[in-house]
Amino acid sequence: MSQAAPAVRPLPAVYAPVTERVGPATLVRGPIGPVESALRLGLGLAWTGLCTLGFLVVLIALLPSRVARINVGNVYGSFVGKGCAWLTGSRYLIHNRAAAHAERPAIYVANHASLIDIFLGAWLSPMNLCGVAKKEIIYYPFFGQFFWLAGHLRIDRGDRGKAVASLKALADIVKKNALSIFIWPEGTRSKDGRLRPFKKGAFHLALSTGLPIVPMVIAGSHKAWEARSLRLSREQVDITVLPPIDTSGWTKETLDEHIREVEAVFAAALPEDQRPLAAAEPARRAA
């Protein structure tokens, strides 16, 4: 028989106290049936569509200004993301959210193991932030088209030259307009929830902009909504915003070392079942 989960499950000591909660106060963990899963996902799609239509008028009026559109996208993301998270039926505990609203721009990086992570990132991102996602996000109903129209960046992971050029252009826009960036450093979703080696794109952005890196650690989302599945499960998902990592002393020569340091920060903050296995590190893509 399923048991009610404790208010906060045991997590690594780096986790700050809970500052926000979305979802049931008392959680009974376990799979959600196919009919209820379909209903919840359908309601999530309907909520996303409703928000898209509501914000689209504002977005069209601001087409001449990319920065203004980016900010409309940030507000839109907070509505869509929080609503979709609530509709999954899981409980989301936010730790140290204030760290995601620092006055200084930053590069926010998060691990990625579930489709719901995209909505969590959209919900918790501060204003004046440009998101970076794979080009295929355009095919996500409503959300992907709005992401593109709002001026956020889509990159072609299959074409390194184009990806690098896009990130260089983004660095110029960020420096000119004092924007933050949100990027998934693993480059793709983890199939089993375990942390994957980070690609270099986010860290080249740190070098070219001088912005600090703010880790956003997501624990448990791979159980709430498994990768490549339409079945949901009632789980507890913890999202912690960790203190910023200064990048002002980074150089190209020490970049690989700094990437490993940031990976270690994530690994230490994740539960044991999401830490990378002790195995040889796969080769990184240059981008």
Predicted regions and their residues:
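A generic structural signal for well-ordered alpha-helical segments
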Residues: 84-85, 147, 174, 206
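Non-catalytic C-terminal accessory region of glycerolipid acyltransferases
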Residues: 1-31, 35-38, 164-287
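Conserved beta-strand termini and adjacent loop/short-helix elements that scaffold enzyme active sites
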Residues: 95-97, 134, 155-157, 242-244, ...
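Catalytic core of membrane glycerolipid acyltransferases/transacylases, capturing the structured
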Residues: 52-74, 78-79, 85-88, 100-160
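Membrane-anchoring hydrophobic helices of lipid-metabolizing enzymes
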Residues: 2-106, 287
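Generic preference for hydrophobic
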Residues: 94, 108, 131, 239-241
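A generic local structural motif
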Residues: 92-96, 116-118, 167-169, 225-227
